[in-house]
Regions:
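Thiolate-centered catalytic microenvironments shared by cysteine-dependent enzyme domains
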Residues: 163-168, 233-265
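Structural microenvironment flanking redox-active thiols in thiol-disulfide oxidoreductases
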Residues: 70-109
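Short acidic-hydrophobic, aromatic-tinged amphipathic segments that line or gate anion-handling sites
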Residues: 44-46, 112-119, 211-212
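Thiol/disulfide oxidoreductase modules built on the thioredoxin-like
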Residues: 108-111, 118-158
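Flexible, polar/low-complexity N-terminal or interdomain linker segments that lie immediately upstream
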Residues: 20-43, 156-202
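Positively charged, proline/Ser/Thr-rich regional signature most characteristic
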Residues: 168-238, 242
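Hydrophobic membrane-insertion alpha-helices, especially the h-region
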Residues: 7-23
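Short active-site neighborhood of thiol/selenol oxidoreductases, capturing the structured segment around
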Residues: 50-70, 76, 192-193
Length: 267
């Protein structure tokens, strides 16, 4: 009996800690974190940069030692390709003044950014890398993101710049129709409903397992296989996007978001 009570206590503590991890993960990536100095509507000053040279500048704060910077390289390449087609936008890479040979690092990542500066991150209010900020011609930060972005945030960033995201949706999402087809053909797909237990108990798909978002960091490592295809479901797209980031950080490489079927065009 004592061992059983101890095991239950350990599980409850693990779930509590996982909830704290989710909240920490989410708020660290929020541009409105009061502890994060650089935020939207703040003016940014970098020596040698005249913001008025472009209507908008996409600033990337990077580090050669940052694994999430390297893992975001494919997105940065798509971003650079879209910006290169516009005359009123540019990209600017900023590295810490303590680093060197950042240009060689960008070539290694195959991210074509010509404007490169070294600066004190603390003086700019940048506490985490990678950081992406959209800066207007007056040097005012209009939007910013921190960390490796999940698919919907990548699309949101591109949309705010008026750019089309060329990444195939098939790489990160699956439609209802395609999911039904995979299940009908008995393909190995694990559908995870990340809503809370009450919502799941009220109504859920027969084939879905319930792992609430606040339990995901702990339970995913213990209950899911890195080799399986995982489909995430929730009524809130921002929650599935966050869940995608959590699983990606833990090494899951076959993660898809369940999205509605496309609406056929009206005649």
């Amino acid at each position: 009996m004592t061992i059983r009570i101890l095991n239950i206590a350990i599980v409850l503590v693990a779930l509590l800690l996982s909830g704290l991890l989710v909240r920490k993960f989410f708020f660290q990536r929020s541009a409105q974190n009061p502890n994060y100095q650089l935020a939207a509507n703040e003016k940014l000053r970098i020596n040698g940069i005249n913001w008025a040279d472009s209507d908008r500048t996409v600033l990337l704060a990077l580090s050669k030692e940052c694994k999430y910077c390297a893992r975001s390289a494919e997105f940065y390449r798509r971003l650079a390709a879209g910006i290169a087609k516009r005359n009123n936008m540019r990209m600017l890479a900023v590295f810490s003044e303590k680093e060197s040979e950042a240009d060689a690092y960008l070539r290694q990542l195959e991210v074509p950014i010509r404007d490169l500066r070294y600066a004190s991150f603390s003086s700019l209010g940048i506490k985490s890398v990678p950081t992406v900020a959209i800066v207007d011609r007056n040097g005012v930060v209009t939007y910013m993101w921190v960390g490796k972005l999940p698919p919907l945030e990548e699309k949101d960033l591109m949309s705010k710049l008026g750019l089309e995201d060329t990444r195939s949706p098939d790489e990160w999402s699956i439609t209802e129709a395609n999911l039904r087809a995979k299940l009908a053909h008995k393909e190995q797909v694990t559908l995870i409903d990340i809503r809370d237990r009450t919502a799941y108990a009220t109504n859920h798909r027969d084939e879905a397992r319930n792992i609430p978002l606040d339990e995901l960091p702990v339970r995913a490592q213990n209950e899911l296989s890195l080799d399986e295809t995982i489909v995430l479901y929730s009524n809130d797209p921002s929650e599935t996007d966050l869940a995608y980031s959590i699983l990606e950080t833990q090494g899951f490489t076959h993660v898809l978001l369940l999205v509605p079927d496309a609406t056929p065009p009206s005649e």
